[in-house]
Amino acid sequence: MERWDYEPSNEWDEVEELEDLEDLLPVLGHRNWIQIADMAFPSLNSPGVQTILVDDEILPVLDFVLELLNEQPHIRPNVWLDAELDFIREDWAQGITQFRRELYERLRGLPVNKLPHEQLIAKLSEVSKQFQVVVIKTRTCLPYTSVFLELDCAYWDEQRERMLRNSMER
């Protein structure tokens, strides 16, 4: 099974507020989520949600989290983005064009999915009823810039799961 391909940005630096995340990652597994949120993302009150406030922007936090995930032998991220992000014009939100460019550079080599923002929030709310969700709230003030990381098993994939299920049906 191939390891997901992540090339850290040169902006990567340790995020002090996320030291606890390093200890938490070995406990997390497939079906858990990590969200790196913009400042206006609402506080979720589901019991399965843990929120961490960091004094940094989304992109350096993303670098740090992806680097930590890359060190884990058991999990890999599936990335989810707000579908709205691709449609925001620079004159509506200054800095969004550069943010998008830098974000997509960082995500090169990772599976990226998109859904409308409200659907992603609903997905997180549903998941948090049974599984741990870690929300890392940043100081980024650009709309629809949250990055949602759905954790998946790093040593098993959908194709192998289908083959397993097919052989069990025989």
Model-derived segments and spans:
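Ordered, amphipathic secondary-structure segments that act as subunit-interaction surfaces
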Residues: Q72-E105
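A phosphate-binding glycine/aspartate-rich beta-alpha loop in the early core of alpha/beta enzymes
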Residues: P47-P77
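Gly/Ser/Thr-rich loops at beta-strand to alpha-helix junctions
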Residues: M39-P42, L85-F87, C141-L142
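Electropositive phosphate-/nucleotide-binding environments in soluble metabolic enzymes
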Residues: V15, E19, D55-L59, D63, ...
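Structural motif
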Residues: N32-Q35, Q50-T51, R76-W80, P111-N113, ...
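Long, hydrophobic N-terminal alpha-helical segment
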Residues: E2-I58
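Glycine-rich, aromatic-bearing surface loops/beta-hairpins
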Residues: W92-R170
